[in-house]
Amino acid sequence: MKVLAAMSGGVDSAVAAARAVDMGHDVVGVHLALSRSASGKRGCCTPRDAQDAAQAAQTIGIPFYVWDFSEEFQEKVIDNFISEYSAGRTPNPCLRCNEHIKFSSLLRRALALGFDAVCTGHYARVFLDEDGTYQLHRASSWAKDQSYVLAVLQQAQLKHCYFPLGATPSKKLVRQEADERGLKVSKKPDSHDVCFIPSSNTGAWLSQRIGRRDGDIIDDLGQRVGSHTGAFAYTVGQRKGLRLSSPAWDGKPRYVLDIEPISNTVVVGPRESLRVDELSGAFTTTGWCFTSRPIECSVQVRAHSDPVSAIAFIRDDVLVVRPDEPVFAVAKGQSAAIYRGTRVLGQLMIDNTKKYASS
C-alpha cells in the first residue's frame, strides 16, 4: 500500500510513520505548513516542528516534503474559530482541522497523487466489517483515545485512514519505541494548546482580531453585575476571570450560563443552571443510519470527558440526544461524539440545548 504519512513534528506521527514502514508499505512523509508565522513554542505548525518532522523522516529513511495548506487552514480553521466565538459559540479547532485539512484537503491531494491512505499519529482504530462498512472505534488506550476529534469523518474518508497507534496500550510505550528507533522527538512534550494561539490566551488573541466590544454582565435575574470588553472572551461554564461587581444573593459561585452576541451580553448564574438534559443540531455519520426511532448509545461532549449513556434519534431533520443523566456546561458550537460501545456512530454539532423542568 502506498501511504502518505502526515508528520506534525511530534513523537506520535513519527512512530506511526515508522510502523507503516515496518508493515511493508511504501511510505512518504509530509509536513503540513499551516501558518507562515514563526511564532509559537508548542503546537504542530511552527518552523521548528517542520525541522523535527524532517529529521524524523530522515531517521526512518523515507522521502519527506512540506506542503503549504496555510490558506485553507486560515479559511477553514482560523477564520471559523473567530466567527464562531464572535457568534457566542465555542468551536473545536482540532476537529475542524481534521474535517477540512488533514482528511479533506490533504487526503484529496494524496489520492490524486496515487496514494492509498493517509497515515497519522491519532489514537483511534478503523475496522472493515462484513457489510463493507468502515467502522471508527476508540483506541485501545482510552486515556489517549482521540476518536472524539475524528467523529466528523465519513465513509469516503475512513476508507483511506491509517492509524498505526490505535492498539498501543500507552503513550509511554510510544515514547520508549521512539527512543529505541533513535527518533530525537521521543522526549518532545505533547501539545495541548490551540496551535495557532502562541500565548495560549484565547481572549487576548481574539480581542486583537475582533476588537474591543464593551458590554454588560447580567445575572439570571436580569440584574447587571459587571462589565466586559468582549463577550467573545467568555465561554459557557467559565467561572474564573469574571470580575463581578457584586456577590451573588445566595453566596454561591457564579458561572457563565450564556453569551448573547446580538446584545453583547454575558449571562451568569449558579452551577445548577448549567444543567443540560437534551442536545440537538446538525450531524454527520461515520456510516451509521440514524432514524426517528431512538437508539441506545453514549454521548461525549468534550475531548477528554467521560461518555454518558443516552438515546439518540432524528427529529425535524436534526439529531436529538438525551443523556440518561444531565451534562453540564455544554456550549453551542461544541461537538458531541455519539458511540455504541467503542464504535463511533457520528458527530453532533450542538446548536441547541434544553433543560427539563425539575420534578
From Swiss-Prot:
Organism placement in taxonomy: Bacteria, Bacillati, Actinomycetota, Actinomycetes, Micrococcales
UniProt keyword terms in alphabetical order: ATP-binding, Cytoplasm, Disulfide bond, Nucleotide-binding, RNA-binding, Transferase, tRNA processing, tRNA-binding
The protein, known as: tRNA-specific 2-thiouridylase MnmA
Cystine pairings recorded for this chain: C97-C195
GO biological process: tRNA wobble position uridine thiolation
Statement: the UniProt record of this protein carries the keyword Cell cycle: no
Any Gene Ontology CC annotation: cytoplasm
Pfam families recorded: tRNA_Me_trans, tRNA_Me_trans_C, tRNA_Me_trans_M
Protein role: Catalyzes the 2-thiolation of uridine at the wobble position (U34) of tRNA, leading to the formation of s(2)U34.
Encoding gene per record: mnmA
Family per similarity comment: Belongs to the MnmA/TRMU family.
Residues flagged as site, Interaction with tRNA: H122, Q334
Top-rank taxon: Bacteria
